[in-house]
Swiss-Prot record:
PANTHER family: EXOCYST COMPLEX COMPONENT SEC6-RELATED, TUMOR NECROSIS FACTOR ALPHA-INDUCED PROTEIN 2. It comes from Mus musculus (Mouse). May play a role as a mediator of inflammation and angiogenesis. The keyword Repressor does not apply. Residues 33-45 have a biased composition (Low complexity). Coiled coil: none annotated. This is Tumor necrosis factor alpha-induced protein 2. GO terms for biological process: angiogenesis; cell differentiation; exocytosis. Residues 9-111 are annotated as: Disordered.
């Protein structure tokens, strides 16, 4: 299997290109044999060799003289480069120099020999470019005039072409590293390329003599673009510095290429664009070359079997960092607006990588969450006490789980918002599965670890966990209320099971105390209730390590239990009172007990106001003697507690021993009337079984 490291080992002979866009020259290719032969033969010819033969007929001689005069006129233009070679005190800036070529150069005096031009070019004197051009034109004129053999023309043309080879090397050498060139020299190189483009267009206007090889168009502007492409490849392929610890080789490579491209293009915009003629499209040319090489590199990389991290990094660069941090950076955005570089990878490849990323990331999140839950459950079973935070039992499980989820979500959103939306739905599914596993693990702990010393504090720590889960999911995940309830349903069960376990021993202690109501036939209800409240009060400090909201909710559970157990005692049919006075006395006891229960529970945090009417209204039913009044009270009671059934009503009416059976049936039928009230969100009488 191919490895990533193999791909990034670089190519043989590749060297680092330090700095920012210094356009360092790669070793020049050896000249071809034909070029070397042409160069060798140049020493045998002079500019006179390119003129018509002296043995030409008179007419041809006259024509040659006219052309010689014309060539002298061409020298006038070239003098701008030969005069004033000495440096002036105040050398002009490159931006002040004229780089536009003159279409018809004129010369003063005879042309230098080919050997002299060769020597000048070898010394980098670009000003002789115009004289090389003049030789080319003289050759064309000689060929057009006739009188010279084809062999002679071909031989002389080879001399001119050899000079052009030297000139091209010099010009492209300057343009390969434009920031290293003197301003005037760069201006000369640009002017030569522009002039050559003009000559290409001129040559396209008519055919050459049959004996001459077609050497135009030379396409020097296109050659320059090729040089830029080579520079881009050298810069981007350079081996980056040693990868910082924690970064993969691929990550270092991405960072190197991205940073190099951005910095180099900024240099092009700031320093080269003002100097290059518009026809060069210098910003577009460099941008396209860097983009092409960057894209080629990533396309090749995408063919490898990438690890999870490199898949993510590749997408991050293609979809986010490259278009946003490079192409749309403050210095480049406006310049690259019309270039249309496009994406580094084709859409099909991007979709494939995105699918791979989503699969990898969801699998990773699932494994990390499962591991976090496993470690947490091990701490419970090993009887490790939970942490204490602000006086509350604390577990890191919820924080760990939500951080894992959040990191996966953030990574996806860093690629694109669309990928972020895709992974959101997948992560919600995995979170729901994790919460179900959490509930199962917690239930198993409740069942098997009752004898552990830290059993109860670990229960409270897990109940407290629910708060962080609820608030974080509700704030971060914008989902519907129903979806949120379904997602968090396992936590509601976990909390309820935790409450049941924490309160189990208390409720067992209260059971014999509630039995005293019926055992004493409500002879001492005040004292009995005081004993019940004292027992509850002594157990409450333990629950201070719950979060405030859960401590209040726990107290609501206690409140419900007290009211429920009290009603159960009233429904036992053990007490039958035949006089109105006895019934009114019991009603007063019930009211007093109801006030005591309500006051105690409210003082300790219960917000179950829905329970406030449960006992007082039963007391009122017992107190009333008029059948019609009792019916109204029963109907009202049923609207407050829709789960109040005929069985419960029969049990309460059984206390009223002076009520005729016919009236009992009439009162009971009131519950057959549909009041339109829906099932209550909190059950009360459905928790009470009557016989």
């Amino acid at each position: 299997m191919l490895k990533m490291v193999t791909f990034f080992q670089g190519f043989p002979g590749q060297q680092s290109v330090p700095g920012t866009l210094n356009f360092a020259v790669s070793p020049q290719k050896p000249r071809s044999t034909s070029e070397a032969e042409s160069e060798t033969s140049m020493s045998e010819a002079s500019s006179e060799d390119l003129m018509p033969s002296p043995e030409a007929p008179d007419g041809e001689e006259e024509s040659a003289k006219k052309k010689e005069k014309k060539s002298k006129g061409l020298a006038n233009m070239f003098s701008v480069f030969t005069k004033g070679k000495k440096k002036k005190k105040d050398q002009p800036r490159l931006s002040d120099l004229e780089v536009q070529p003159k279409p018809r150069p004129e010369l003063d005096g005879p042309l230098p020999t080919v050997e002299e031009l060769k020597e000048a070019l070898e010394h980098g004197r670009l000003e002789v470019a115009w004289q090389v051009l003049a030789l080319e034109r003289q050759l064309e004129a000689a060929a057009a005039a006739g009188g010279m053999s084809n062999e002679e023309l071909v031989w002389r043309q080879s001399k001119v072409e050899a000079l052009y080879v030297l000139l091209c090397d010099q010009v492209l050498g300057v343009l390969r590293r434009p920031l290293e060139a003197a301003p005037e020299r760069l201006s000369q190189a640009l002017a030569v390329v522009s002039q050559e483009e003009l000559e290409d267009r001129r040559a396209s206007g008519g055919p050459l003599a049959a004996a001459l090889e077609a050497t135009r168009p030379r396409r020097w502007l296109q050659r320059w673009r090729g040089v830029v492409a080579e520079v881009a490849a050298e810069r981007l392929d350079a081996q980056p510095a040693t990868a910082p610890e924690g970064r993969s080789e691929a990550e270092s490579r991405f960072l190197h290429m991205g940073r190099t491209m951005k910095e180099d293009l900024e240099v092009v915009v700031e320093r080269l664009k003002p100097l290059f003629p518009d026809e060069f499209n210098v910003v577009r040319t460099y941008a396209e070359s860097y983009h092409y090489h960057f894209a080629s590199h990533l396309c090749a990389l995408a063919q490898f079997e990438l690890c999870e991290r490199d898949t993510y990094l590749l997408l991050l660069w293609v979809q986010n960092l490259y278009p946003n941090d490079i192409l749309n950076s403050p210095k480049l955005a406006q310049e690259l607006q019309g270039v249309g570089l496009g994406s580094l990878l084709p859409p099909k490849q991007i979709r494939l990588l995105e699918a791979m990323f989503l699969s990898n990331e969801v699998t990773s999140v699932k494994q990390l969450m499962a591991r976090a839950l496993e470690l947490e459950s091990q701490r419970w079973t090993q009887d490790v006490a939970p942490q204490s935070l602000d006086g509350h039992c604390h577990s890191e499980l919820a924080i760990d789980i939500l951080q894992i989820i959040s990191q996966g979500q953030t990574k996806a959103e860093n690629i694109t918002s669309d990928v972020g939306m895709q992974i959101k739905q997948l992560l919600l599914v995995e979170l729901a599965a994790l919460l179900r596993s959490y509930q199962r693990a917690f239930d198993e702990f409740l069942e098997k670890s009752k004898l552990l010393r830290n059993y109860r504090v670990n229960i409270m720590a897990n109940i407290n966990n629910c708060l962080f889960f609820w608030t974080s999911v509700e704030q971060k995940w914008q989902i519907s209320h129903d979806s949120l309830n379904r997602l968090l349903e396992p936590l509601k069960d976990l909390k309820a099971h935790g409450f049941d376990t924490l309160l189990q021993s208390l409720f067992l202690d209260l059971k014999p105390l509630f039995k005293k109501f019926t055992q004493t036939r409500w002879a001492n209800p005040v004292e009995t209730l005081e004993e019940i409240i004292t027992t509850v009060s002594s157990s409450l400090p333990e629950f201070s390590e719950l979060q405030d909201c859960f401590r209040e909710e726990l107290m609501e559970t206690v409140h419900l239990h007290l009211v429920k157990e009290y009603i159960i005692r009233l429904c036992k049919r053990r007490l039958v009172l035949k006089t109105a006075e006895q019934q009114q006395q019991l009603a007063r006891h019930i009211l007093a007990n109801a006030d005591a229960i309500q006051g105690f529970c409210t003082e300790n945090g219960s917000t179950a106001t829905w329970l406030h009417r449960a006992l007082p209204m039963i007391a009122e039913i017992i107190r009333l003697q008029d059948s019609s009044a009792i019916k109204i009270e029963v109907a009202t009671y049923a609207t407050w507690y829709p789960d109040f059934s005929k069985g419960h009503l029969n049990a309460i009416l059984a206390i009223k021993g002076n009520l005729p059976s016919s009236e009992v049936r009439s009162i009971r039928n009131i519950l057959d009337i549909n009041t339109g009230v829906q099932e209550p969100p909190r059950p009360l009488f459905s928790l009470i079984k009557v016989t």
